[in-house]
Regions:
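Interaction-mediating elements
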Residues: 22-146
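Bacterial Sec-dependent N-terminal signal peptides
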Residues: 1-24
């Protein structure tokens, strides 16, 4: 009987967690956190939004905005930016920390930053030449991937 109850509880928990996980739904830009809205107004003024959505994983909420030119911005639940991916153009200089911009322009003068991603451990930038550079939070280069 104990095994049956344990199995039933495990299946119920699995069903609930599966139902809550991986829930993506489109939203209006006005439903984004205030910081995310301000970021878009400042750095993507004049760009048309193709899709804004909220992504809910088990314990995490993120927002993603895709623009009609193919650029994408991803935000944490508090509205701080997580990733900016411009695919076909350079990430705006105002988004890139000055130390990273200086390193890239000094070491890769013919390349531009087309994607930047940050988390609580590091910054990752993708260059137009295909290289991916990783910097720690003190902006020291810690990895290069090609």
């Amino acid at each position: 009987m104990k095994k049956f109850l344990f199995l039933a509880a495990a299946l119920l928990a699995l069903g609930i967690s599966t139902a809550c996980a991986d829930s993506d739904r489109p939203i209006d830009v006005a439903q984004l956190p205030q910081k995310a809205q301000q970021f878009i107004q400042k750095h993507f003024a004049g760009e048309k939004v193709a899709l804004a959505k909220v992504e809910r994983d088990f314990l995490e909420v993120r927002y993603e905005v895709i623009f009609t030119d193919g650029a994408k911005a991803e935000f944490y639940k508090d509205g701080e930016w997580k990733e900016v991916d411009c695919r076909y153009s350079s990430v705006l200089a105002a988004v890139i920390p000055a130390q990273i911009a200086q390193y890239v322009s000094g070491h890769y003068p013919d390349a531009s930053i087309v994607q930047i991603d940050r988390d609580k451990h590091d910054y990752e930038v993708k260059l137009s030449n295909g290289l991916e550079l990783t910097f720690d939070l003190k902006f020291n280069l810690i990895d290069i991937d090609d």
